[in-house]
């Protein structure tokens, strides 16, 4: 390894606890499990002979870690390896694992994929009902959890819903964060129009990806009170990175392949 740089100092940790307290989650007894899944498309370093190497990385950060990582700082951190030599890929992964584990104060997994290994991955879509094509009027783009409603019939159903219309904003740069949101639940029927209005109400809301998804989970859980609930977001790529957090109180396994906008 060459170019001795303290790459770790580029990383900016953001405490999960502050936001969780803000939305009145019990930090010692979270109502969900989950992970934040990062895909890195612009990852490069040098081998021991100085030949540039490239890979796509998939990183999974456990929901019980103390911190998330501010994405701009993460991009700067990743780019700091572009001119560094490593004897092999294992050495590179070990550096990433040690630095990121220290930053988040929690569990992390990192896998590198060659282009050949993923070239046959297909673009997929969420399964279930897309709620985007409703003939409804939208009048508010300010975060409004009270939009959420259940239907009048008192029948327990199991339903998978999704939207591609979600937008929130980065609290650091105020740039838009675009996402597709998947919601699977078992419980009293959630009114589709109310759910879409609620999700669109994030359009002027400033919050990190992970925080938005925990807020959505918490709002639906508290207002609609489903027996089971899973919320999964796949955000579009920015700076060569997409972030895909999920939260669930049941046995949920998210698919990890790209959506059309990723």
Swiss-Prot record:
Catalytic reaction(s) noted: 7-aminomethyl-7-carbaguanine + 2 NADP(+) = 7-cyano-7-deazaguanine + 2 NADPH + 3 H(+)
Coiled coil start-end: none
GO biological process: queuosine biosynthetic process; tRNA modification
A GO term, aspect molecular function: preQ1 synthase activity
Domain of life of the native organism: Bacteria
NADP as UniProt keyword: yes
Residues that bind NADPH: 71-72, 238-239
Gene Ontology CC: one annotated term: cytoplasm
Active site positions, chain numbering: 170, 177
SUPFAM superfamilies xrefs: Tetrahydrobiopterin biosynthesis enzymes-like
Enzyme's top EC category: oxidoreductase
Oligomer and partners: Homodimer.
Name of the protein in its database record: NADPH-dependent 7-cyano-7-deazaguanine reductase
Organism: Buchnera aphidicola subsp. Schizaphis graminum (strain Sg)
Upper lineage: Bacteria, Pseudomonadati, Pseudomonadota, Gammaproteobacteria, Enterobacterales
Gene name for this UniProt entry: queF
């Amino acid at each position: 390894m060459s170019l001795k740089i303290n790459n770790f100092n580029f990383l900016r940790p953001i405490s999960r606890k502050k936001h969780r307290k803000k939305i009145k989650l019990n930090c010692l007894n979270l109502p969900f499990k989950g992970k934040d899944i990062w895909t890195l498309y612009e990852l490069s370093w040098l081998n021991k002979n100085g030949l540039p190497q490239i890979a796509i990385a998939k990183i999974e950060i456990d929901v019980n870690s103390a911190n998330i990582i501010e994405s701009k700082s993460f991009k700067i951190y990743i780019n700091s390896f572009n001119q560094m030599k490593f004897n092999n890929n294992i050495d590179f992964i070990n550096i990433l694992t040690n630095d990121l584990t220290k930053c988040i104060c929690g569990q992390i997994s990192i896998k590198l994929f060659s282009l050949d290994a993923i070239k046959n991955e297909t673009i997929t879509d969420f399964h279930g009902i897309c709620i985007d094509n409703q003939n409804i009027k939208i009048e508010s783009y300010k975060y409004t959890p009270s939009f959420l409603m259940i239907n009048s019939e008192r029948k327990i159903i199991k339903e998978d819903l999704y939207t591609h219309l979600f937008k929130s904003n980065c609290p650091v740069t105020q740039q838009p964060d675009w996402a597709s949101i998947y919601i699977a639940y078992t419980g009293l029927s959630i009114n589709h129009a109310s759910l879409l209005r609620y999700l669109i109400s994030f359009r002027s809301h400033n919050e990190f990806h992970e925080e938005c998804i925990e807020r959505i989970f918490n709002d639906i859980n508290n207002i609609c009170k489903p027996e089971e609930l899973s919320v999964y977001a796949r955000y579009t790529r920015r700076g060569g990175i997409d972030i895909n957090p999920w939260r669930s109180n049941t046995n949920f396994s998210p698919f990890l392949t790209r959506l059309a906008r990723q």
